[in-house]
Amino acid sequence: MGKLSTHVLDTAHGTPAAAMRVELYRIAASGTPELLKRVVTNLDGRTDAPLLSGDKMRTGIYELQFHVAEYFEGRGAELAHEPFLDLIPIRFGIADEDGNYHVPLLVSPWSYSTYRGS
């Protein structure tokens, strides 16, 4: 069986983004999101266990939500009253239940990048 994982790197400080809140949603055919999991990244900017694995790993549309403003405020960053990046949603599809899907996020208070990792 495959798995879904993530890894968050803080490019403003050059470190893993430890203690960032991340939520995983499955998007129903109607477009309604269903919360599957809430996690906080560990000291390495990763989750302690895969976000999905085993029989929970199903094809479909998913969304990861990264609470970046909350994270950077916790690091002492001076953000505007309305931060440029608050919550970053990344919506993606899982086409193969046996595939390994890794969604890295490289982020600063002003920019982000992601890709499908392995």
Swiss-Prot record:
Keywords: Hydrolase, Purine metabolism. Coiled coil: none annotated. GO terms for biological process: purine nucleobase metabolic process. Pfam families: Transthyretin. SUPFAM superfamilies: Transthyretin (synonym: prealbumin) (SSF49472). One of its GO terms (molecular function) is hydroxyisourate hydrolase activity. CDD domains: TLP_HIUase. Substrate binds at H7, R46, Y115. Gene3D superfamilies: Transthyretin/hydroxyisourate hydrolase domain (2.60.40.180). Belongs to the transthyretin family. 5-hydroxyisourate hydrolase subfamily. HIU hydrolysis also occurs spontaneously, but more slowly. Homotetramer. This is 5-hydroxyisourate hydrolase.
